[in-house]
Amino acid sequence: ALTIRALRTLAARAYATADGIGGGRKGVVHVNLPFRKPLEPIPVETDHADAIDDAGFDYAGAFTVMTGGATIPTVQQMQTLLALLERHERGIIVCGPKSLGENFVSAVAQLSQRTGYPIFADPTSDVRFGGHVQDTAVIGGYDTFLNAPPTWEAPDVVLRFGGVPTSNVLNSYLERIDVKHRVQVSADGVW
């Protein structure tokens, strides 16, 4: 039998997991609660209804505390990425849903300009439109040419930011190309 305290803790953990606290992916949480057949109350000698008042309802603090913080790459990770980008001229940047902060669009545009890598921008990425498209290679209509057999070499590097792109054509292309290096950057750490 679950105690009320255990149920509160379970509810707090389920909420924290669904909210992505602790660096996990935000999303649906499935909770299994064991019930006896036929899902109706059965009197048990050890049940004490008056004990419910002492079950912690007057306790205002949290039974379970989960926290999350900003994920910031280390200096070594940034140096490794920089060395990788300097070694390879052919690459693409894929921006999926859920941009990574208010400065992301300008930062990824600068990255594209410095590396020469075009940006394949998902419609939900916030990168497809804006002032940066005047001087940055932002490609939004990639579905029109990625389905055809490629007449170009596969990129050496694929930098992916955000969630999985919504385009099946782009996802199929990314799966079938032989890439030396794939780098995934996402706010929730999921790849």
Say what each PLM segment does.
Residues A1, R182-G189:
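Short, acidic/small-residue loops that bind anionic groups at enzyme active sites
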Residues L2-A6, T67-A70, V94-P97, V157-R160:
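Flexible, glycine/proline-enriched loop segments at strand-loop-helix junctions
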Residues R5-A11, G22, P97-N103:
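Active-site glycine- and acidic-residue-rich loops that bind
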Residues L10-R13, Q76-T80, G141-F145, V169:
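Well-ordered alpha-helical segments embedded in enzymatic catalytic cores
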Residues R13, T17-R87:
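Conformationally flexible catalytic loops at phosphate/diphosphate-handling active centers
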Residues L33-L39, P97-S99, S125, G189:
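Glycine-rich beta-alpha junction loops
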Residues R90:
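Hard-cation-handling environments
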Residues C95-V183:
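Glycine-rich, anion-gripping cofactor-binding loops and their flanking helix/strand elements
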